[in-house]
Amino acid sequence: MLEKFSDSLYKCSFSRKNLVLLLLFFCVAAHAQLKTNESEVGLGWSNNSVNTVIFRNSALTTFKNWQFTAYYNPEGKIVLAKRNLNSNQWEKIITPYSGNVKDAHNCISIAVDADSFLHVSWDQHDTRLRYAKSKMPLGLELGEEQSMTGNDESKVTYPEFHNLPNGKLLFCYRSGASGRGNMIVKSYDVKTRKWTSLQNNLINGENQRSAYWQICVGKKGIYVSWVWRESWDVSTNHDICYAFSADGGQTWEKSTAEKYSLPITKATAEIAWKVPEKSSLINQTSMTVDAQGNPYIAGYWNDNGVPQYKVVYLDKGKWNKIDTDFHTKPFVLGGGGTKRIPISRPEILTNKSMLYLLFRDEERGNKITLGSTNLGKKQWKFTDVTEYSVGQWEPNLDKELWNDKLELHIFSQNVSQADGEGLAEEEPQTVRVIEIKKLPNN
């Protein structure tokens, strides 16, 4: 009897050891799919999310093997930094410029033009345009602040740069206040080194509402999607709309190739996906395009009890939706100001048959997480990129590097965000760039 008991105990112990080893193996194997490299840039302001809001466009950009980034330091000064992609060492400069970091809308947007000059815009929330560019090619030292065209530059919010395949640079922003703003688009020509107005009112809120958009540049043109907001209250967000330009932003059309009469209004906008008000529909997320030029729009809203990430995409002329359903705790989006939300807005990428979502979720410990699915299977897998919390971080990635080399570099900082534009009391946190060496491909 004792021998049988000892033998059973040994077998049980052996099985448990094997199970532990097996689990460890699978954990290591899963982690091996996401080998990362981290480089530290410097200490940044972290009492709110101004350094990491998703609508920076861009926080990180690469031009000819030189990667640039920008952030506010603990004193609210703009820090510009660059490195060679083969190095973890960053060259930094504290500029003479600063911003009102107490408002998380006042983010920094950067781009490098085709002549290798750095362009920077910052510190704007229904305030005057703030813009400067580097004195030298690939330089970090900025010249004097300047206007672009002088028109529609007194009430600027959400500045963002976009590089076009033809070498021109786009600058987009909202002119006017929340709930009654219009979309402005300007174009920079490297030959003349001058800005011109491309669209003085691409999307018109008709003084009744605002469009909150995201932009993607693909080989075939410029893609824009947006939600409408009927007031300052985020709960009035509704509908996901769409437009495309094949000529650098001069003319726009629907997915059916029907030409828009500009400006686009609520009555004329193509609705890619109908979402009613009070659905906790988030604004200003991300979009991408596949090799065939089909757009993919990421977001989240509540259509079944709990807000979940979703992807709306175009395939063979028809709009489709992919759901996720891993978030378990309900929450409601409502009110104004920068919100403290349990999940970040998502960033989306696609490569061949694979679709990727980059996000943060309190239920996963506020770590940076990568979701992946094969479009043929539509089964999601989730892997944490970091082993530590990044607080109220939202994803910003190097889109130029991704488009050129399919390499994923992420701007990262552990930040806080009190609800409604409040401030936390946090020690300055390190700004990092995280490189994912190999993405899941099945």
Segments the model singles out, each with a brief description of its role:
Residues 16-22:
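Sec-dependent signal peptide recognition
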Residues 1-15:
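N-terminal secretory signal peptides that target proteins for export/translocation
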Residues 10, 22-23:
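A periodicity- and composition-biased signal for non-globular, repetitive helical segments
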Residues 9, 18, 29-30:
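Prokaryotic Sec-type signal peptides and long signal-anchor helices
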Residues 11-13, 28, 217:
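Secreted/luminal cysteine- and crosslink-motif detector
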Residues 23-24, 304:
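Amphipathic, positively biased hydrophobic alpha-helical segments used for protein targeting
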Residues 24-32:
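Hydrophobic h-region of N-terminal signal peptides that target proteins for export
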Residues 33-442:
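Extracellular, repeat-based ectodomains that mediate carbohydrate processing or recognition
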